[in-house]
UniProtKB/Swiss-Prot annotation:
GO terms for cellular component: periplasmic space. Belongs to the carbohydrate esterase 15 (CE15) family. Optimum pH is 8.0. Shows more than 60% of its maximum activity in the pH range of 7.0-9.5. 20% of the activity is retained at low pH range and at pH 10.5, while no catalytic activity is found at pH 5.0 or 10.5. It comes from Unknown prokaryotic organism. This is Carbohydrate esterase MZ0003. It holds the Pfam family GCE_fung. It is an enzyme of class 3 (hydrolase). Changing residue 291 to A: No effect on esterase activity. Gene3D superfamilies: alpha/beta hydrolase (3.40.50.1820). GO terms for biological process: polysaccharide catabolic process. Is inhibited by PMSF and by NaF in vitro, which is consistent with the catalytic nucleophile being a serine.
Length: 432
Protein backbone atom coordinates (compact mmCIF):
# COMPACT_ATOMS: atom_id res chain seq x y z
CA UNK A 1 0.00 0.00 0.00
CA UNK A 2 1.38 3.39 -1.02
CA UNK A 3 1.14 6.20 1.51
CA UNK A 4 1.23 9.97 1.07
CA UNK A 5 1.61 12.26 4.03
CA UNK A 6 0.11 15.58 5.09
CA UNK A 7 1.41 17.41 8.17
CA UNK A 8 -0.94 19.61 10.19
CA UNK A 9 0.77 21.57 12.98
CA UNK A 10 -1.20 22.56 16.06
CA UNK A 11 0.41 24.62 18.81
CA UNK A 12 -0.81 23.19 22.09
CA UNK A 13 -0.12 24.71 25.48
CA UNK A 14 -0.58 22.52 28.51
CA UNK A 15 -2.01 24.21 31.72
CA UNK A 16 -0.25 -2.57 29.78
CA UNK A 17 0.50 -4.37 29.33
CA UNK A 18 -1.50 -7.31 30.80
CA UNK A 19 0.46 -10.53 31.19
CA UNK A 20 -1.27 -13.09 29.01
CA UNK A 21 -2.19 -15.86 31.48
CA UNK A 22 -1.58 -18.69 29.03
CA UNK A 23 1.91 -17.31 28.34
CA UNK A 24 2.92 -16.94 31.97
CA UNK A 25 1.48 -20.25 33.10
CA UNK A 26 3.47 -22.41 30.63
CA UNK A 27 0.33 -24.41 29.74
CA UNK A 28 0.25 -28.13 30.31
CA UNK A 29 0.05 -30.59 27.46
CA UNK A 30 2.83 -29.02 25.40
CA UNK A 31 6.45 -30.03 24.92
CA UNK A 32 9.08 -28.39 27.13
CA UNK A 33 11.62 -31.21 26.81
CA UNK A 34 14.47 -30.71 24.34
CA UNK A 35 14.77 -34.48 23.96
CA UNK A 36 11.20 -34.61 22.63
CA UNK A 37 11.74 -32.10 19.83
CA UNK A 38 10.98 -33.98 16.58
CA UNK A 39 13.49 -34.27 13.78
CA UNK A 40 12.98 -31.54 11.22
CA UNK A 41 14.59 -30.00 8.17
CA UNK A 42 14.51 -26.24 7.72
CA UNK A 43 13.82 -24.71 4.30
CA UNK A 44 17.07 -23.34 2.88
CA UNK A 45 16.82 -19.54 2.66
CA UNK A 46 19.37 -19.65 -0.17
CA UNK A 47 17.38 -21.98 -2.44
CA UNK A 48 14.64 -20.54 -4.64
CA UNK A 49 11.21 -22.17 -4.83
CA UNK A 50 12.17 -23.63 -8.23
CA UNK A 51 15.31 -25.20 -6.72
CA UNK A 52 17.81 -22.63 -8.00
CA UNK A 53 20.64 -22.05 -5.54
CA UNK A 54 21.32 -18.46 -4.52
CA UNK A 55 25.07 -17.91 -4.76
CA UNK A 56 25.42 -14.13 -4.76
CA UNK A 57 24.17 -11.04 -2.97
CA UNK A 58 22.71 -9.87 -6.27
CA UNK A 59 20.56 -12.99 -6.57
CA UNK A 60 19.31 -12.52 -3.01
CA UNK A 61 18.54 -8.84 -3.47
CA UNK A 62 17.04 -9.15 -6.96
CA UNK A 63 15.03 -12.35 -6.59
CA UNK A 64 15.14 -14.46 -3.46
CA UNK A 65 14.43 -11.73 -0.91
CA UNK A 66 11.19 -10.76 -2.62
CA UNK A 67 10.25 -14.41 -3.01
CA UNK A 68 10.70 -15.07 0.73
CA UNK A 69 8.70 -11.98 1.67
CA UNK A 70 5.90 -13.04 -0.66
CA UNK A 71 5.84 -16.50 0.94
CA UNK A 72 5.42 -14.97 4.40
CA UNK A 73 2.70 -12.67 3.08
CA UNK A 74 0.85 -15.48 1.33
CA UNK A 75 1.04 -18.15 4.02
CA UNK A 76 1.53 -16.44 7.38
CA UNK A 77 1.16 -12.72 8.04
CA UNK A 78 -0.98 -11.74 5.06
CA UNK A 79 -0.56 -8.95 2.56
CA UNK A 80 -1.49 -5.30 3.06
CA UNK A 81 -4.18 -4.30 0.52
CA UNK A 82 -3.05 -2.53 -2.63
CA UNK A 83 -3.83 1.13 -3.07
CA UNK A 84 -2.82 4.46 -1.61
CA UNK A 85 -3.35 5.95 1.83
CA UNK A 86 -3.05 9.64 2.60
CA UNK A 87 -1.74 9.97 6.15
CA UNK A 88 -2.70 13.11 8.04
CA UNK A 89 -0.28 14.12 10.81
CA UNK A 90 -1.76 16.40 13.44
CA UNK A 91 1.33 17.46 15.32
CA UNK A 92 1.18 18.78 18.87
CA UNK A 93 4.09 21.12 19.53
CA UNK A 94 6.83 19.57 21.65
CA UNK A 95 6.79 20.47 25.34
CA UNK A 96 9.26 19.99 28.17
CA UNK A 97 8.59 16.86 30.20
CA UNK A 98 10.15 14.50 32.74
CA UNK A 99 11.48 17.30 34.91
CA UNK A 100 12.89 19.13 31.91
CA UNK A 101 15.01 16.21 30.69
CA UNK A 102 12.81 15.46 27.68
CA UNK A 103 10.64 16.96 25.00
CA UNK A 104 7.27 15.25 24.70
CA UNK A 105 5.43 15.18 21.39
CA UNK A 106 2.04 13.63 20.71
CA UNK A 107 0.98 13.19 17.09
CA UNK A 108 -2.38 12.00 15.84
CA UNK A 109 -1.92 10.04 12.62
CA UNK A 110 -5.14 9.70 10.63
CA UNK A 111 -5.43 7.18 7.80
CA UNK A 112 -7.12 9.57 5.41
CA UNK A 113 -9.30 12.67 5.35
CA UNK A 114 -12.69 10.98 5.74
CA UNK A 115 -14.53 11.67 8.96
CA UNK A 116 -14.64 7.96 9.77
CA UNK A 117 -10.95 7.37 8.99
CA UNK A 118 -9.20 5.48 11.80
CA UNK A 119 -6.37 7.20 13.64
CA UNK A 120 -3.57 6.33 16.03
CA UNK A 121 -1.74 8.41 18.63
CA UNK A 122 2.06 8.48 18.44
CA UNK A 123 3.80 9.44 21.70
CA UNK A 124 7.43 10.57 21.45
CA UNK A 125 10.01 11.50 24.08
CA UNK A 126 13.28 13.09 22.91
CA UNK A 127 16.29 14.33 24.91
CA UNK A 128 15.57 17.99 25.67
CA UNK A 129 18.96 19.46 24.86
CA UNK A 130 19.97 17.38 21.85
CA UNK A 131 22.20 19.28 19.43
CA UNK A 132 21.63 16.89 16.52
CA UNK A 133 18.81 14.73 15.22
CA UNK A 134 17.96 12.02 17.73
CA UNK A 135 17.99 8.23 17.15
CA UNK A 136 14.77 6.61 18.34
CA UNK A 137 13.45 3.33 19.72
CA UNK A 138 9.93 2.72 18.35
CA UNK A 139 7.52 0.08 19.59
CA UNK A 140 3.88 -0.68 20.21
CA UNK A 141 2.39 -0.97 23.70
CA UNK A 142 -0.36 -3.21 25.05
CA UNK A 143 -2.75 -0.99 27.02
CA UNK A 144 -2.42 2.61 25.90
CA UNK A 145 0.30 5.24 25.67
CA UNK A 146 -0.60 6.53 29.13
CA UNK A 147 0.49 3.21 30.67
CA UNK A 148 4.17 3.60 29.75
CA UNK A 149 4.81 6.51 32.15
CA UNK A 150 3.07 8.39 34.95
CA UNK A 151 3.36 11.62 32.95
CA UNK A 152 -0.09 13.18 33.41
CA UNK A 153 -0.01 14.91 30.03
CA UNK A 154 -0.04 11.67 28.01
CA UNK A 155 -3.36 11.34 26.23
CA UNK A 156 -5.69 8.58 27.39
CA UNK A 157 -6.58 6.33 24.49
CA UNK A 158 -10.19 6.39 23.35
CA UNK A 159 -9.79 2.98 21.71
CA UNK A 160 -11.02 -0.34 23.06
CA UNK A 161 -8.73 -1.63 25.85
CA UNK A 162 -8.82 -5.08 27.39
CA UNK A 163 -10.45 -5.01 30.82
CA UNK A 164 -7.90 -5.57 33.60
CA UNK A 165 -9.00 -5.17 37.22
CA UNK A 166 -5.41 -5.19 38.44
CA UNK A 167 -4.79 -2.06 36.39
CA UNK A 168 -8.18 -0.54 37.20
CA UNK A 169 -9.37 -0.91 33.60
CA UNK A 170 -13.09 -1.64 33.39
CA UNK A 171 -15.63 -1.83 30.58
CA UNK A 172 -12.80 -1.90 28.00
CA UNK A 173 -12.06 1.78 28.56
CA UNK A 174 -8.82 3.47 29.64
CA UNK A 175 -8.80 5.64 32.75
CA UNK A 176 -6.41 7.41 35.11
CA UNK A 177 -5.94 4.36 37.33
CA UNK A 178 -3.87 2.68 34.61
CA UNK A 179 -1.51 5.62 34.07
CA UNK A 180 2.08 4.39 34.36
CA UNK A 181 1.26 0.74 35.11
CA UNK A 182 3.70 -0.47 32.42
CA UNK A 183 6.44 2.07 33.17
CA UNK A 184 8.87 -0.67 34.20
CA UNK A 185 8.80 -2.01 30.66
CA UNK A 186 9.56 1.38 29.13
CA UNK A 187 12.78 2.75 30.56
CA UNK A 188 12.19 6.25 29.21
CA UNK A 189 14.60 8.11 31.49
CA UNK A 190 17.34 5.54 30.88
CA UNK A 191 17.05 5.90 27.11
CA UNK A 192 16.87 9.71 27.29
CA UNK A 193 20.01 9.81 29.44
CA UNK A 194 21.83 7.77 26.79
CA UNK A 195 20.82 10.15 24.01
CA UNK A 196 17.94 8.16 22.53
CA UNK A 197 14.32 9.03 21.96
CA UNK A 198 11.49 6.61 22.68
CA UNK A 199 8.27 6.49 20.67
CA UNK A 200 5.22 4.30 21.08
CA UNK A 201 1.70 3.65 19.79
CA UNK A 202 -1.07 1.69 21.46
CA UNK A 203 -1.59 -1.40 19.30
CA UNK A 204 -5.35 -1.19 19.83
CA UNK A 205 -5.46 2.17 18.08
CA UNK A 206 -4.48 0.28 14.93
CA UNK A 207 -6.40 -2.95 15.46
CA UNK A 208 -8.00 -4.03 18.75
CA UNK A 209 -6.56 -7.36 19.87
CA UNK A 210 -9.58 -9.61 19.63
CA UNK A 211 -11.13 -11.68 16.86
CA UNK A 212 -13.69 -9.34 15.31
CA UNK A 213 -13.10 -8.72 11.59
CA UNK A 214 -15.14 -5.51 11.34
CA UNK A 215 -13.03 -3.33 13.63
CA UNK A 216 -9.65 -1.66 13.33
CA UNK A 217 -7.76 -0.47 10.31
CA UNK A 218 -8.36 -3.62 8.28
CA UNK A 219 -12.10 -3.01 7.98
CA UNK A 220 -11.46 0.54 6.76
CA UNK A 221 -9.74 -0.87 3.68
CA UNK A 222 -12.33 -3.52 2.83
CA UNK A 223 -13.80 -3.51 -0.65
CA UNK A 224 -17.50 -2.87 -1.10
CA UNK A 225 -19.55 -5.59 0.64
CA UNK A 226 -16.40 -7.17 2.15
CA UNK A 227 -16.81 -8.20 5.81
CA UNK A 228 -13.74 -10.33 6.55
CA UNK A 229 -10.15 -10.36 5.30
CA UNK A 230 -9.63 -12.38 2.13
CA UNK A 231 -7.60 -15.57 2.35
CA UNK A 232 -4.17 -13.98 1.95
CA UNK A 233 -4.95 -10.54 3.36
CA UNK A 234 -3.31 -9.10 6.43
CA UNK A 235 -3.94 -10.37 9.91
CA UNK A 236 -3.65 -8.24 13.02
CA UNK A 237 0.13 -8.56 13.28
CA UNK A 238 0.55 -7.27 9.73
CA UNK A 239 -1.86 -4.42 10.51
CA UNK A 240 0.17 -3.48 13.59
CA UNK A 241 3.36 -3.58 11.50
CA UNK A 242 1.70 -1.27 8.97
CA UNK A 243 1.09 1.18 11.82
CA UNK A 244 4.78 1.12 12.71
CA UNK A 245 5.67 1.95 9.11
CA UNK A 246 3.23 4.86 9.23
CA UNK A 247 5.06 6.13 12.31
CA UNK A 248 8.26 5.98 10.26
CA UNK A 249 6.52 8.09 7.63
CA UNK A 250 6.01 10.71 10.31
CA UNK A 251 9.63 10.50 11.50
CA UNK A 252 10.75 11.40 7.98
CA UNK A 253 8.96 14.74 8.41
CA UNK A 254 10.28 15.56 11.91
CA UNK A 255 13.58 17.44 11.85
CA UNK A 256 14.26 16.55 15.51
CA UNK A 257 14.42 12.82 14.70
CA UNK A 258 17.14 10.95 12.84
CA UNK A 259 14.88 8.76 10.72
CA UNK A 260 17.93 6.89 9.43
CA UNK A 261 18.52 5.61 12.98
CA UNK A 262 15.24 4.14 14.14
CA UNK A 263 15.17 0.81 16.00
CA UNK A 264 11.84 -1.01 15.93
CA UNK A 265 11.24 -3.18 18.99
CA UNK A 266 8.51 -5.24 20.60
CA UNK A 267 7.74 -7.83 23.24
CA UNK A 268 5.78 -11.08 22.87
CA UNK A 269 3.03 -10.64 20.22
CA UNK A 270 4.40 -7.15 19.64
CA UNK A 271 7.85 -8.72 19.17
CA UNK A 272 6.36 -10.80 16.36
CA UNK A 273 5.14 -7.48 15.01
CA UNK A 274 8.51 -5.72 15.28
CA UNK A 275 10.20 -8.58 13.41
CA UNK A 276 7.66 -8.44 10.58
CA UNK A 277 7.87 -4.64 10.43
CA UNK A 278 11.68 -4.74 10.37
CA UNK A 279 11.66 -7.47 7.74
CA UNK A 280 9.43 -5.69 5.24
CA UNK A 281 10.30 -2.03 5.88
CA UNK A 282 13.99 -1.53 5.17
CA UNK A 283 13.89 2.01 6.55
CA UNK A 284 14.21 0.56 10.05
CA UNK A 285 17.92 0.56 10.87
CA UNK A 286 17.67 -2.04 13.63
CA UNK A 287 15.10 -4.65 14.65
CA UNK A 288 14.67 -5.96 18.21
CA UNK A 289 12.54 -8.96 19.18
CA UNK A 290 11.91 -9.60 22.88
CA UNK A 291 10.50 -13.04 23.81
CA UNK A 292 8.52 -13.16 20.56
CA UNK A 293 8.23 -16.96 20.44
CA UNK A 294 5.93 -18.81 18.06
CA UNK A 295 5.15 -16.73 14.99
CA UNK A 296 8.08 -14.48 15.89
CA UNK A 297 11.69 -15.55 16.31
CA UNK A 298 11.14 -19.20 17.37
CA UNK A 299 11.26 -22.02 14.83
CA UNK A 300 7.78 -23.45 14.22
CA UNK A 301 9.08 -26.90 13.25
CA UNK A 302 10.46 -27.51 16.76
CA UNK A 303 6.94 -27.68 18.25
CA UNK A 304 8.46 -26.59 21.56
CA UNK A 305 6.18 -24.58 23.85
CA UNK A 306 3.52 -22.75 21.90
CA UNK A 307 2.66 -24.42 18.60
CA UNK A 308 1.13 -23.24 15.35
CA UNK A 309 -2.17 -24.93 16.22
CA UNK A 310 -2.28 -23.35 19.67
CA UNK A 311 -1.52 -19.84 18.45
CA UNK A 312 -4.05 -20.07 15.62
CA UNK A 313 -6.69 -21.43 18.01
CA UNK A 314 -6.11 -18.85 20.74
CA UNK A 315 -5.50 -15.90 18.42
CA UNK A 316 -7.12 -16.68 15.05
CA UNK A 317 -6.94 -13.03 13.98
CA UNK A 318 -3.17 -12.55 14.29
CA UNK A 319 -2.21 -14.25 11.02
CA UNK A 320 -3.85 -14.64 7.63
CA UNK A 321 -6.34 -17.49 7.31
CA UNK A 322 -3.98 -19.59 5.14
CA UNK A 323 -1.65 -20.04 8.12
CA UNK A 324 -4.33 -22.13 9.83
CA UNK A 325 -3.90 -24.92 7.27
CA UNK A 326 -0.50 -25.64 8.85
CA UNK A 327 -1.91 -26.54 12.26
CA UNK A 328 0.00 -29.73 13.20
CA UNK A 329 1.62 -29.57 9.74
CA UNK A 330 4.58 -27.30 10.42
CA UNK A 331 6.88 -29.38 8.21
CA UNK A 332 4.77 -28.50 5.18
CA UNK A 333 5.32 -24.76 5.62
CA UNK A 334 7.46 -23.33 2.79
CA UNK A 335 9.01 -21.00 5.38
CA UNK A 336 10.22 -20.93 8.96
CA UNK A 337 11.25 -18.12 11.24
CA UNK A 338 14.97 -18.15 10.40
CA UNK A 339 13.85 -16.84 7.01
CA UNK A 340 11.98 -14.00 8.70
CA UNK A 341 15.18 -12.95 10.46
CA UNK A 342 17.04 -13.27 7.15
CA UNK A 343 14.66 -10.72 5.59
CA UNK A 344 16.20 -8.11 7.92
CA UNK A 345 19.63 -8.67 6.35
CA UNK A 346 22.04 -6.99 6.10
CA UNK A 347 20.62 -4.67 8.79
CA UNK A 348 21.31 -5.62 12.43
CA UNK A 349 18.74 -7.61 14.36
CA UNK A 350 18.71 -8.51 18.06
CA UNK A 351 16.89 -11.57 19.41
CA UNK A 352 16.35 -11.20 23.16
CA UNK A 353 15.09 -14.26 25.08
CA UNK A 354 14.46 -15.26 28.71
CA UNK A 355 15.60 -18.44 30.48
CA UNK A 356 12.24 -19.27 32.11
CA UNK A 357 10.12 -18.38 29.09
CA UNK A 358 9.84 -21.91 27.74
CA UNK A 359 6.50 -21.15 26.12
CA UNK A 360 8.39 -18.84 23.73
CA UNK A 361 11.17 -21.43 23.13
CA UNK A 362 14.31 -19.35 23.77
CA UNK A 363 16.54 -22.08 22.32
CA UNK A 364 14.39 -22.15 19.18
CA UNK A 365 14.82 -18.39 18.90
CA UNK A 366 18.60 -18.81 19.00
CA UNK A 367 18.47 -21.59 16.39
CA UNK A 368 16.43 -19.34 14.10
CA UNK A 369 19.11 -16.68 14.44
CA UNK A 370 21.68 -19.32 13.47
CA UNK A 371 19.54 -20.28 10.49
CA UNK A 372 19.71 -16.72 9.14
CA UNK A 373 23.50 -16.57 9.40
CA UNK A 374 24.25 -17.75 5.85
CA UNK A 375 22.19 -14.95 4.31
CA UNK A 376 23.88 -12.29 6.41
CA UNK A 377 27.34 -13.60 5.54
CA UNK A 378 26.50 -13.71 1.84
CA UNK A 379 25.58 -10.03 2.12
CA UNK A 380 28.94 -9.22 3.68
CA UNK A 381 28.16 -8.96 7.39
CA UNK A 382 29.47 -10.98 10.31
CA UNK A 383 26.24 -12.92 10.76
CA UNK A 384 25.84 -14.54 14.19
CA UNK A 385 29.09 -14.92 16.10
CA UNK A 386 27.95 -17.80 18.29
CA UNK A 387 28.35 -21.50 17.54
CA UNK A 388 26.32 -22.65 20.55
CA UNK A 389 23.53 -21.25 22.69
CA UNK A 390 25.15 -18.53 24.83
CA UNK A 391 25.11 -18.50 28.61
CA UNK A 392 22.62 -16.12 30.25
CA UNK A 393 23.59 -12.44 30.40
CA UNK A 394 26.13 -12.74 27.57
CA UNK A 395 25.27 -10.32 24.77
CA UNK A 396 26.38 -11.51 21.34
CA UNK A 397 26.92 -8.20 19.53
CA UNK A 398 27.39 -9.47 15.97
CA UNK A 399 25.08 -8.21 13.21
CA UNK A 400 22.66 -10.94 14.22
CA UNK A 401 22.68 -10.36 17.95
CA UNK A 402 21.45 -12.64 20.70
CA UNK A 403 20.95 -12.28 24.43
CA UNK A 404 19.45 -14.65 27.01
CA UNK A 405 18.23 -12.90 30.16
CA UNK A 406 17.64 -14.82 33.38
CA UNK A 407 13.96 -14.69 34.29
CA UNK A 408 10.46 -14.79 32.88
CA UNK A 409 8.45 -13.53 29.93
CA UNK A 410 8.82 -9.81 30.51
CA UNK A 411 10.67 -6.61 29.62
CA UNK A 412 13.09 -5.43 32.30
CA UNK A 413 15.63 -2.69 32.94
CA UNK A 414 18.31 -5.24 32.03
CA UNK A 415 16.68 -5.73 28.63
CA UNK A 416 16.85 -1.99 27.99
CA UNK A 417 20.53 -1.99 28.93
CA UNK A 418 21.01 -4.63 26.23
CA UNK A 419 18.94 -2.75 23.65
CA UNK A 420 20.97 0.40 24.22
CA UNK A 421 24.33 -1.38 24.17
CA UNK A 422 23.42 -3.14 20.92
CA UNK A 423 22.12 0.08 19.34
CA UNK A 424 25.26 1.93 20.43
CA UNK A 425 27.35 -0.74 18.72
CA UNK A 426 25.42 -0.99 15.46
CA UNK A 427 23.28 2.10 14.96
CA UNK A 428 24.83 5.13 16.59
CA UNK A 429 28.35 4.44 17.78
CA UNK A 430 27.11 5.74 21.12
CA UNK A 431 24.30 8.25 21.00
CA UNK A 432 25.50 10.38 23.89
Amino acid sequence: MQRTCVLIVLIVTSTMWTPDPDVYAQPRGFNYDEAQVPKYTLPDPLVMVDGTKVTSAKQWNDKRRDEVQQLFEAYMYGKVPDGETELIFTDAKGERALGGAAIRKQVKISFGEKEDAPAMDLLIYLPADAKVRVPVFLGLNFHGNHTIHKDKEIWLTESWVRTNKKFGITKNKANELSRGVAAGRWQIEKAIAKGYGVATIYCGDIDPDFNFPSNGIQAYYYKKDQTIPEKGQWGTIAAWAFGLSCAMDYFETDTDIDHKKVAVLGHSRLGKTSLWAGAIDTRFALTISNCSGCGGAALSRRRFGETVRRINTSFPHWFCSRFHQYNDKEDKLPIDQHMLIALCAPRPVLINSATEDKWADPHGEFLAAQGADAVYRMLGTGGLDAKKWPEPNKLVKSTIGYHLRPGKHDVTARDWDVYIEFADHHMTGGAE
